[in-house]
């Protein structure tokens, strides 16, 4: 009876394996909330009898991000390209020869004469080795986007640390863009924007997860074979 149930057990395991292959909705990638690292802001200092507060923005300029909690828009325009070529060529050619015209008179013996042994050409060898190798690699990337970020730290020298992110989900495909870095208030334009090439220690990531991302990766069995395949 036990042997007859084996096909039933195998069928159940097969159905369970198929159920595990069903497409599931990818979880949303959580972006750290910028407000978590905001420093406590002290209240603005006001002077009695004064109509102008020196802690506020200038009367003659547009309002730009300058304090913790303010928002600034980053215009991301990143282009990168790199290429490298290498070639190697080596060669080696060597030869060796030896003769023994006189060897204790044995060169005149019948053994040498009957076998037609030439004592002047006893040893001869040559070796030649050639190697040629060439390789090239190239990589390029382009990223264009506009991302609103928030000031999370204001340093004593006036520089600002910003951080922001955005999630977009279309047809179960999640696209996440994240940015953090340090900027100078003087680089912020009148429209409260700043270019990404003016960000210090910029960390920009653009990732995706979903059906398209899964199709761009090899299966688990292929990846396992790549690790153990010796050829």
Curated annotation (Swiss-Prot):
It is a lipid-anchor. Coiled coil: none annotated. One of its GO terms (cellular component) is cell outer membrane. Residues 1-20 form the signal peptide. A lipid is attached at residue 21 (N-palmitoyl cysteine). One of its GO terms (molecular function) is cytoskeletal motor activity. One of its GO terms (biological process) is bacterial-type flagellum-dependent cell motility. Keywords: Bacterial flagellum, Cell outer membrane, Lipoprotein, Membrane, Palmitate, Signal. It holds the Pfam family FlgH. Belongs to the FlgH family. The basal body constitutes a major portion of the flagellar organelle and consists of four rings (L,P,S, and M) mounted on a central rod. This is Flagellar L-ring protein. It comes from Desulfotalea psychrophila (strain LSv54 / DSM 12343). The lineage of its organism: Bacteria, Pseudomonadati, Thermodesulfobacteriota, Desulfobulbia, Desulfobulbales.
């Amino acid at each position: 009876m036990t042997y007859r149930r084996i096909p039933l057990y195998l069928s159940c395991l097969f159905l369970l394996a198929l159920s595990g292959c069903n497409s599931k909705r990818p979880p949303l990638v959580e972006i750290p909330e910028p407000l978590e690292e905001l420093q406590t802001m002290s209240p603005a200092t006001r002077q009695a009898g004064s109509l102008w507060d020196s802690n506020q923005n200038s009367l003659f300029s547009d309002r730009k991000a300058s304090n913790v909690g303010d928002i600034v828009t980053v215009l991301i325009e990143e282009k990168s390209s790199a290429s490298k070529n290498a070639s190697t060529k080596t060669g080696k050619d060597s030869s060796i020869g030896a003769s023994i015209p006189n060897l204790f008179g044995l060169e005149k013996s019948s053994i040498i004469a009957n076998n037609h042994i030439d004592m002047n050409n006893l040893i001869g060898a040559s070796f030649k080795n050639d190697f040629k190798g060439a390789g090239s690699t190239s990589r390029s990337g382009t990223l264009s986007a506009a991302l609103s970020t928030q000031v999370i730290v204001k340093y004593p020298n006036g520089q600002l640390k910003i951080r922001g992110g955005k999630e977009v989900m279309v047809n179960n495909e999640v696209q996440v863009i994240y940015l953090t870095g340090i900027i100078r208030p003087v680089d912020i334009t009148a429209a409260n924007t700043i270019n990404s090439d003016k960000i210090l220690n910029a960390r920009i990531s653009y990732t995706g997860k979903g059906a398209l991302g899964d199709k761009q990766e090899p299966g688990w069995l292929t990846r396992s074979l790549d690790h153990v395949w010796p050829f």
